[in-house]
C-alpha cells in the first residue's frame, strides 16, 4: 500500500491546477470513504464460516483485490497523464511563474526552496503532525474510554465514531468549495477550533453517555474534514511540476509517524492520569496545531473562484 497510495494521490495533484487541489483532495477523501464502506459491506456478506466455526476470508480479500485491480485498469485505460498535465498548465488558473510558491532558487548549483517558503513548509508539516497526534489519540482510544466509563459503552462508542465518519464524508465536498472562497489556512483554523471545542466539551461532559455526544462527534467529523482536505493541498502548493510525489511523501511521513507515536504517548498519560486524560490530551495538541498554521505564510490558495464550478476544466480539445 505504501507503493500504491502516495503515487495515486500525487497523480491528482499533478493534473489539477493548484487553486483547485482542495476540491480535488475532497474528492479523494470521499472516494476513500466509499472504499472503506465497500470493505465494511463485504466483511458482512463475503466472510463465511464452516461447521467448526472457522471464518474463511478468501472471498473478502478477493473482492477487495478485485476492486483495486478494476480501479487500476480504469486508471490505465482512461487517464492520459501527459495530456492532462499539458491542459492543466495551459489553464494555470491565473497563477503566473512569479507567483508560483514552488519556485526554487539555485544555491551552489542545487535547487532549493527559498528560506521563507521552506519555513512555511516545515510549519505546515508541524501542523499536520500535531493534528494527528491529537485527533488520532482520541479516535484510537475512544472505544476503550467508553467501555471503561459507560454502561453499554462499546455500542455507544461505535455509534459516535460512525457519526463522526458520516459527518466528515458529508462535509468533504462542501469544505472543498468553501476553502476555495475563504482560503485553506482559514478553513484549517476553523477546523482546529471546532475540534478543540468538541474535545473541550467532551472533557467535562463525557463521563456519562448522553445523546448530545453524537452532536459533539458530528462537529469533530466536520473538523477532521476541514483539516485533512486542506493540509495536503497546502503542502502541494509549495511543490512544483515534477516533484509532487516527493512532497506527498513528506505529508505521509509526518502523518503516519504521528499516528504511530501518539498511541504510545497517550497510553502513558492514561496510565498515569486515568481515562479522563484522553480528551485533554487531544485538546492540547489540537490547540498547539493552531500556532504553526497561523505562522505559515505560503501554501494557501488564491481564493478567487471560477464563475462556474466546471469553468476551470473547460479547455479546448
Describe every region a protein language model picked out.
Residues 83-126, 309-317:
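Juxtamembrane intracellular "pre-TM" segments in multi-pass secondary transporters
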Residues 45-67, 268-286:
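A membrane-interface helix-boundary motif in multi-pass transporters
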